[in-house]
Design a protein with these regions (language model features):
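Bacterial Sec-dependent N-terminal signal peptides
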Residues: 1-23
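Residue-level recognition of alpha-helix boundary/capping or hinge positions
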Residues: 15-21, 29-31, 35-38, 59, ...
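Juxtacatalytic substrate-recognition/specificity segment
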Residues: 17-168
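Acidic/His/Gly-enriched intrinsically disordered linker/tail segments
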Residues: 22-23, 92-94, 112-116, 124, ...
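Surface-exposed helix-capping loop/turn segments at secondary-structure junctions
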Residues: 63-70, 243, 247-250, 307-308
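Conserved beta-propeller blade repeats
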Residues: 107, 114, 313-328, 353-374
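A flexible loop/linker signature enriched in serine peptidases of the S9 family
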Residues: 192-195, 311-316, 331-344, 358-362
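Multi-bladed beta-propeller domains
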Residues: 291-315, 345-363
Length: 375
């Protein structure tokens, strides 16, 4: 006799910690009206500035989305490593900020704390608003199991022959929207802006007929500048929606995604705006293609082509001339897939040869005046 069991298993998400532990740090905590600020001795000054920034942007973000976290948000300021980033753990209601300003080749210059705290808190608020079952239930599995009819007398069931498992996510927000609205922040925000770096990346995709499709914008894990293109495309599309249909549409879409049976961004946009996500994307695509082609057409009349010095790899950055002027050092990810997998190379112009100096170099090189040392 076949026996079938259907059940729901509530799942918890376990994230591995990739950063090193630092037991030598002496941690402190203080409270503001809406945040718990955590810092170690070396980041006290940054933490106090961060507290001021966080309270200043709190009403702007929460009023924009019409949502407030259920309790004080944890804001952790740390600076133990030669690293910079920000992260929002929206189920934990926690933000981690590395104190050192981020110097990223694909972004322009922005005020670090104001930018990163607003960006990450926008994640906290917008993604918590989109949750289907709150922060305590991140998801579920619908499962069904069947067993062989034959079984041992001392065993309750036969050997399992069927296992069907269907995940039901508690949050269903595509990356382009999550990152797009976090960069948009709120109306008239100027901590993060559409800078020339972002414009260059999107413009290059448009004029070379290489725009990310609506589906391609829904994932990370791309090579080269593909992941950054998800950020840029999401920022541009979110801004387009806000300009064409009102910025309240962004908040309303997040609210629509919180509906228990709403798992489609295409349908969620349709329910809010009255047009499908595919149609909105097509309008957006046509709009920016017309814009960039109009700007580029005059340049095409008398094009000026430079000489390509390096063609291998998707990242070739920070070239520095040798004091002699006959060679240069640069960073490249040749042989690797991702933008940040760079190594230091030395190129001899006369010989036309490259030499790898050191793997895993991420900052711009500098020559000693004698030309014998490089930092």
């Amino acid at each position: 006799m076949n026996k079938s069991i259907a059940h729901i298993v509530l799942c918890t998400m376990l994230f591995s910690q990739v950063e090193y532990n630092h037991p030598e740090l002496n941690w402190h905590t203080f409270d503001t009206e809406h945040f718990k600020i955590h810092y170690h001795d070396e980041t006290e000054k940054t933490a106090r500035e961060a507290a001021t920034v966080a309270e200043a942007i709190y009403p702007k973000i929460t009023s924009f989305y019409g949502f407030e976290p259920y309790q004080k948000t944890h804001l952790v300021l740390l600076d133990p490593d030669d690293y910079s980033n920000g992260a929002a753990y929206y189920y934990d209601n926690k933000i981690m900020i590395w104190a050192s300003p981020l110097d990223f080749e694909l972004r322009g210059s922005h005020r670090w704390l104001q930018n990163v705290i607003t960006h990450e808190f926008a994640h906290i608020v917008s993604l918590q608003k989109s949750m289907k079952a709150g922060t305590r239930i991140p998801g579920a599995y619908l499962q069904s199991m069947n067993y062989e009819e034959e079984k041992r007398p001392d065993v309750l069931y036969g050997y399992p022959n069927t296992l069907i498992s269907y995940p039901v996510p508690g949050t269903c927000v595509p990356p382009w929207l999550a990152e797009g609205i976090a960069q948009y922040m709120y109306d008239d925000a100027d901590w993060d802006t559409w800078d020339s770096h972002r414009d260059m990346i999107l413009r290059d995709r448009v004029i070379n007929n290489n725009m990310l499709t609506f589906n391609e914008m829904n994932t990370f894990g791309k090579k080269g500048i593909g992941n950054e293109s998800t950020y840029n495309s999401g920022f541009a599309l979110s801004t387009y929606i806000a300009n064409e249909y009102g910025s309240a549409a962004l908040s309303d879409i997040m609210g629509e995604l919180s509906s228990p049976l709403q798992f489609s961004i295409n349908k969620a946009i349709f329910n809010v705006i009255g047009r499908s996500g595919d149609d909105i994307y097509l309008d957006f695509k046509n709009s920016i293609e017309a814009k960039y082609n109009t700007l580029v057409n005059p340049i095409k009349v008398m094009p000026v082509q430079g000489t390509r010095l390096q063609s291998e790899g998707t990242t070739n950055i920070h070239p520095k001339w040798h004091p002699s002027g006959r060679s240069y050092a640069y960073l490249s990810n040749k042989g690797n897939d991702y933008f940040g997998q760079t190594s230091l190379y030395f190129h001899d112009i006369a010989a036309g040869e490259d030499k790898k100096v050191k793997s895993g170099v991420f900052s711009a090189p500098t020559w000693h005046p004698n030309g014998e040392l490089i930092y």
